[in-house]
């Protein structure tokens, strides 16, 4: 069964083949369940002109925010970007492009991409700037927008446990966008807290089957949390 073993020994090996100009899908929600070590490896590699698809773009100095420091991202497709001052600066100066997408629509774009569905219709965004330039059709008397699905050259994902074959379990809310991203990457790389022997995972508990996963690596994680400041 050696040919089914998805484990890699280093983060350099995990991201082998990532090149300038590629599209990267990144799991996580805020700072919860983000593939922080894979992001740091992208920074180390110096890969540039990336299109990044994620719920948000991290914070200053952590998560996807570290890729902004050397201007490695040229375009972001996300739902929320308000926590990152460096992102704001680059956006206002025209150094980075942003496509704001409703959160549920973004999730469905990834899910559809992973399922091989090229497009779908949604009522979300009708009558707003989100609808500009998009096909609109009426179903049962209600207008809907056509949204195209999303796939990536790479998907970087954070899991809790995986076996040698790449079957992955996520931990509580750290699941978030991770399984969606995992399904929609041409090359999907998952970093986890623990790798177990084949057969050790309950098949009923597996969230992402190994068929979607190309590489897995075990890492250690800082797991920062976001603090809401209401008064200074």
Task: Please give the residue ranges for each predicted region.
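Conserved alpha/beta enzyme-core scaffold
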Residues: 1-232
